[in-house]
Amino acid sequence: MVLGSLITACSNLSSGTNFSSLNQLRNSFSKNSELNQDKKELVTSLRDSFEVDSKSATNVLLDAWRFSLQDEKILEKQDPSRFVKAFGSGKSKEDVEPSTGVKGLRLVERYTQNVASIINNVIKLSSQTVTDFSFYYNSSRDFKVQIRLQATGTFDSAQAKSYLSQIGLSDSDIKDKNSISADLIFTYTPPSSNLFSKSSFDTLLRKINFNTNLRLQIIGKDELMQKLLQSNFVGQLADQNFQDQTIDLLPYVLYSIL
């Protein structure tokens, strides 16, 4: 189904519709040949569903997130046209949550821009695969989303030699090594404030803002990556917490129903 008459589809739904499953949400639009690019009515309908049954509605949103990453493999084999319709023009895998790029790893939040650039220049991402996506949601104060990614990349030894003293490695550590791999675990839990509520459905900006706390763990799968994660320079990548990380769930809803 392509992006077409979304307003018509949503206006045909009765006020207070309760979406209890992703399939139900998807089927609500299946009779329409197109969905309109204006997403306001979709956000409104999802907000109305949240008011009827917040637990069911939020589980549908989280399942759309899961479906986009785990089933549709949005990080691995994007449908470019569908991606633009869901996320908007100018967006990329860097804008998918989670991901193993500079933005997804919060490199700028962890380091200065200069240090983040050094890491990005030395380590180049080759592939990222979602290996598991599990979640439960009972209420805005009781939920957990855990996503596991497997990432592989190349290690630019020539670039790294310029930063060996900063990275904390020796020539022998990087000799004849040009590939690295790691498992990444993103765990999202309730924040202390700005809990998910009716006001999280922003009809003006066309967003569904899901605020969380994030724990990000990186586990090296090869000797070089393990040494990197043990170094003073990169060590804080291994396990760190981030407060108030807001995820817009609307693009994942759109990607799952288009």
Swiss-Prot record:
Disruption phenotype: Probably essential, it was not disrupted in a global transposon mutagenesis study. Belongs to the MG439/MG440 family. It comes from the Bacteria. Pfam families: Lipoprotein_3 (PF00938). The lineage of its organism: Bacteria, Bacillati, Mycoplasmatota, Mycoplasmoidales, Mycoplasmoidaceae. This is Uncharacterized protein MG440. It comes from Mycoplasma genitalium (strain ATCC 33530 / DSM 19775 / NCTC 10195 / G37) (Mycoplasmoides genitalium). Although suggested to be a lipoprotein it does not have a good signal sequence.
